[in-house]
């Protein structure tokens, strides 16, 4: 039996220049998990095990024209590591997720130093929420007659 989106567990990863933002879902809601240094393969595998993750959603950095940024290469390299570890991986366009997360923090009156500490996890949360929202729209198990 195929699980609906709300019954599956996803881990969202947003690759920043030095850190990886991590988010997971609780049903159809994305929640932040934290921020890791970019070379944290073992920790991410630990999250996958701890949260019984069915699939990892990796944010793919794209330009406004839809072309891959240089950092997309790093995301793809990391995806190959996950796949070789038996993890199911999917890419998702992460354009503007950091901008959206940063604007939310500014609207809450947060300063630059506060934002810098958690913006990667917030961007991963925004990206994963967008992914979940799109999946629910196309998931036939989620549709009501």
UniProtKB/Swiss-Prot annotation:
One GO-annotated biological process of the protein: rRNA 5'-end processing
Compartment(s): Cytoplasm
Keyword flag Lipoprotein = no
**Record EC number:** 3.1.-.-
Question: What's an example of a GO molecular-function annotation for this chain?
Answer: nuclease activity
Cellular component terms per the entry's GO annotation: cytosol
Looking at its record, which EC class is this enzyme? hydrolase
Keyword Nuclease in record: yes
Gene3D superfamilies linked to this entry: YqgF/RNase H-like domain
Q: What stretches pass through the bilayer?
A: none
Task: Extract the SMART domains matched here.
Answer: YqgFc
Q: Which HAMAP family match?
A: Nuclease_YqgF
Q: What is this protein called?
A: Putative pre-16S rRNA nuclease
Name the species this protein comes from: Tropheryma whipplei (strain Twist)
